[in-house]
Amino acid sequence: MGCLTDSPIFVSAEVSSLLEMKFYKVDTNYLNELRQIDRRVPFNKEFVGKTKKTRPYIGIMLSIEGIDYLVPLTSNKGKRTSYVNMPIFDKNNEKIAYLLINNMIPVPEQYRSAINMNGILMTDPLYYDLLMNEINYLRPNKDSIKKRCKDVRAVKVKSEHRIAITEATANYCLDLLELEKIYNSKK
């Protein structure tokens, strides 16, 4: 488990607090492997736009029942708010992005890397400002986000019923039961 302690509960809690509510990106090959299970797993976008910049699939990490999940962000274009598509607002209460709980994916440590915020600040200050606005909204809402993620996982992995998640909403979410099998095989 590690050399912090013999207690797995302590280590799990320690790891959770260290990785949660920071931005991460996911290895392209791992995403491709997940996509073989569920074709709705999004792509890392390579060389987007006139500047040919990459736009990786990024999100926040949350640990749910010992599984590390990336909950992705997307732009504020054409999305509808629901229990599994959570809007993100800036300090002026303007909608700036969405957190796609329906697209959360389990990601082992070796297939994720923290976003270098200092590097983004130096190369793309506007994008840095957007990401900071997003994280400043997400962090105080961590408990609500985590509850929604736990609800989705309970429905998709354990076949439990949750009032907030209709059958249509559950079908809109990725196949977490099968994706977790890949995750567990990589640990």
Show where each model-derived region lies:
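GIY-YIG nuclease catalytic motif and its immediate N-terminal context
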Residues: 3-53
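C-terminal terminal-subdomain/extension
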Residues: 13-18, 92-187
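Residues at the C-termini of beta-strands that transition into short coil/loop
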Residues: 27, 74, 108
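Residue-level detector of flexible, active-site-proximal loop/helix-junction positions
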Residues: 30, 77, 111
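Low-complexity, polar-biased intrinsically disordered regions enriched in Pro/Ser/Thr/Gly
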Residues: 35-50, 81-92, 115-122
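Compact nucleic-acid interaction/catalytic patches
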Residues: 48, 63-100
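Extracellular structured ligand-interaction cores
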Residues: 54-56, 101
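Catalytic nucleophile-His microenvironment captured as a short glycine-rich beta-strand/loop
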Residues: 56-63
